[in-house]
């Protein structure tokens, strides 16, 4: 585990209500910065915890997809209403079993390019977990 980070920034909206927002400060090819910490690898965001995505269980599918996909054998952060998979520039494959499991669990699964995935996390931080691909 890379450590527990305060991923939510509180601010007042126009009506004087408190809202939470995730603090993604920078991302580029090969890295992402969240709350001042730069990660040079894919990350998993699970209820406020940021950790390295452990791809090893999915590497056996690499030849089939030409890229290490997200497979059901990884530690996927299922405890959420929405799971966002940031596909980098669109290159990260998501295996059918992951899609089926999300449907079985009644979790909204969004597979989006990294920029759109980050925007989605900012809009719904309290009910969304994520896997973010940063290396392509």
Protein language model regions, located:
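Compact, glycine-rich, soluble single-domain proteins
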Residues: 52-77
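Mid-chain, well-packed structural core segment of small domains
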Residues: 76-111
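Short, Lys/Arg-enriched N-terminal segments with co-localized hydrophobic residues
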Residues: 4-21
């Amino acid at each position: 585990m890379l450590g527990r980070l305060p991923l939510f920034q509180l601010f007042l909206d126009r009506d004087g209500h408190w809202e939470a927002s995730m603090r993604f400060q920078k991302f580029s090819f090969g890295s992402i910065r969240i709350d001042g910490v730069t990660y040079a690898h894919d990350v998993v965001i699970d209820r406020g915890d940021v950790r390295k995505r452990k791809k090893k269980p999915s590497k056996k599918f690499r030849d089939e997809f030409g890229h290490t996909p997200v497979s059901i054998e990884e530690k996927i952060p299922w405890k959420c209403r929405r799971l966002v998979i940031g596909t980098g520039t669109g290159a990260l494959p998501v295996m059918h079993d992951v899609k089926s499991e999300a449907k079985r669990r009644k979790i909204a699964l969004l597979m989006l390019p990294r920029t759109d995935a980050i925007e989605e996390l900012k809009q719904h931080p309290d009910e969304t977990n994520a896997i973010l691909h940063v290396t392509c």
